[in-house]
């Protein structure tokens, strides 16, 4: 894929081949466009991940659900979430290719804000599920656009470094917004408010941040579509293009990676938080304090991935993309499988396994995102990335629906061992693709990256 394929319509005031720090930008992309992308990477993932802190709090404070029943309900909520995403990702990608990325991204933040404002008012699991579906529509629109724009804006030579920078902002967003806002509920309770009032206050704050972010992306992202109106494929061709692209073995591998990697953050967020929260409740902690324990485990995994990501981004620009993906998915498999060694998640000696989990998760994400970013054609990139996200949603739907029952009936570690075992299958597929269809080396050069033809 040529650099020009990343963006064919120059933006007003954008210098050809502009550079943002160490990232070379595609033609027509301004520094302010890329800065807005980084802002959205910080807020979108951080705000969507807050649901993993919010849901156990809703269970314990508002709905009074017994801990023994929470795993299955959490898994069912995540499954409904992913079922809604399955219906959103495809149309989101097609809309992005037809009307533009910024409009779709803006709508995603608005839906997320509405859902968070409603979430603490749920008076039953059914109502909570309905609000979760509204949230899922917003997440589907926002994450589809984040992934698509992340493929649009950098030149191919900087794609790995851009993925690392965007992933770093993702991780910072999770730590600052999810961990910080989750801790705010405990702080408010400590200052004399009851837990229910604290929950309302923080959820309204999160909703407000979603609406502010909608305004920022509407103003700051590049307007219009990636190709001119004359170059746009017909709508029917766009719909078919995501499936047709899978004839490229590297895109097929990216879709398989998405089945695991695209949803790792959701799987980790749902079950690491729940594991830590339930362990805290079993130790006699109050709901806010127990939620904080789950949040700390999630934060440790996220922080580890954040520190590891620059290393992974540098490596991905030095090796063949398929080789890089193979390395990343291997780390992902190891990270998930090693959680089987955890007995007490709150014990100090268990922390290393959550650190490895975070490294594995972020590696799988970076490898999959870099590969699809290189291989997706410019004219139908939204549709191809939409199917990439669709594959991720199918994976999350499978893992969370089965995982919730494994969590309750086998043990918390079983969820992660299942994901790790599935990741091993993707690793084997990556070995086959590296052998049969490795594609060209990256433009960054380096070890293990010679052109294979």
PLM features: residue spans?
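Central cavity-lining transmembrane alpha-helices of secondary-active solute carriers
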Residues: 75-93, 299-311
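Juxtamembrane intracellular "pre-TM" segments in multi-pass secondary transporters
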Residues: 3-34, 223-256, 447-453
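Helix-to-loop junctions at the C-terminal end of transmembrane segments
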Residues: 88-100, 308-321, 407
